[in-house]
Each structure stands twice: as C-alpha cells, then as structure tokens.
C-alpha cells in the first residue's frame, strides 16, 4: 500500500417530488439504477444484480469505452421504501481502491421524499477517492432527480 489510509464520511441529501415507493424502486431495480447512477461522463454495467438482504451486485464503471473499475455490493439491510444499508468494495484490476458502508434513508415529506445518503469510506489510494465518491454520488442524485422528473 503506497498511500496512507484515508477515512471520510460523506452525507448528501435531496428532496424529490416523488413518493418514497417510487424513489426506492429506482434503487431496487438494477436496470433503472444503471440508467441514472453513473455520473454524466461515465458508464455503469451490472454483471450481477441481487437486490435482497444478503444479495450481491457486481458492476463495472468508468469512461464509456473503459469500464476498468469493478465494484461489489453486499446488501445488509433492506426495509422497503425506508432504508437500505450496503457495503461496496471498489477495485481497479487487482488493486483495492476503497471500501464503503452506505446508508440510504428514504423519509416521506409533504413534497415527496427526502433521501439522505451517508457514505462512510476508507480509501486505500488517498483523498482523491473520497472526492470521487462525493462527486459521483452527487452526480447520481442529480441524475435521479432528472429521471424522476424533478427535485426540490
């Protein structure tokens, strides 16, 4: 390991003009998730998708012609329309880049849904990975707003 471990917590929130059931379904459906979850200049492809407690997703992401990053997601807790807790390991070839504990909290509001995303991350390649996770998640949430038809 060349870099020191770098720990961070990233918290992002969005209010969507859609009920929790609709927002949750966008996470539960891997085909839908693939359409909005990659940042605008990147692509994402699922090789495996098993959205259930104990289930795993295996995905590749990166520039559209170079999906060099590999992610493995393990779902630990899924409370429909309310909460998802999962871990994610991201690697580049044989090198592990980061491990993250992710919590998605779907809170009903008068306007629709307040989605709070908390990512507790350890980067094995320095603080740039934290910046990448934050900008990637921010881009995904913005894309989800466009996909759902708006956010507040």
What is each stretch, according to the model?
Residues 12-14, 46-49, 71-77, 100-108:
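Hydrophobic/aromatic beta-strand elements that line small-molecule binding cavities or substrate pockets
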Residues 58-80, 84-86:
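Helix-adjacent hinge/juxtasegments
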Residues 7-13, 20, 44, 56, ...:
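Intrinsic-disorder/low-complexity, polar/charged segments enriched in Ser/Thr/Lys/Arg/Asp/Glu/Gln
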Residues 85-87, 91-138:
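Beta-strand/loop substructures that line and gate deep hydrophobic ligand-binding cavities in soluble
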Residues 20-21, 50-52, 76-83, 105-114:
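A short, structured loop/turn motif at beta-sheet edges
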Residues 23, 33, 57, 75, ...:
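Hydrophobic pocket/interface hotspot
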Residues 1-43:
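Hydrophobic ligand-binding cavity/cleft-lining segments
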Residues 11-12, 31-68:
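Short beta-edge strand/loop motif at the mouth of beta-sheet-based domains
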